[in-house]
């Protein structure tokens, strides 16, 4: 991928909930057709099939996944999902990121119990002031 800056698409704008059928390779192909070559993956279930579809787009379309959206903890206690605070989920996040050549996670929103508590934010990997809530891992 070029070293030039890229203008991409945030997947939440075309996520599965907004489309009757969602197949990552097909969607990335359509984005490529209209001039986009980069996306942040957000609000897309990271199933094996979806990760494989994104990987295929990287390999065959020269598509770039700039970042993945991640959650530190459930927004509310008991809320289902994958969270960086869970060791197995954390490993899956890292595996998905490595598979997709991604080195950034975007934290969309802190859990409700951390809002207004700088120490909880720092403990969750966010350094105030946090611009776009991005956490870079290496």
Report residues per predicted region.
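Boundary/entry segment of secreted carbohydrate-active catalytic domains
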Residues: 1-23
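Hydrophobic faces of well-ordered beta-strands that scaffold small-molecule active sites
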Residues: 5-11, 39-41, 65-70, 105-107
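Tryptophan-centric aromatic hotspots in well-structured domains and transmembrane helices
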Residues: 12-14, 28, 36, 69, ...
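Acidic-and-aromatic substrate-binding clefts and catalytic sites of carbohydrate-active enzymes
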Residues: 15-21, 41-53, 73-85, 112-117
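Catalytic domains of carbohydrate-active enzymes, especially glycoside hydrolases
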Residues: 23-47, 96-104
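Aromatic-lined substrate-binding rim segments of carbohydrate-active enzymes
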Residues: 48-69, 129
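Active-site acidic/histidine proton-transfer and metal-coordination neighborhood
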Residues: 60, 64, 79-138
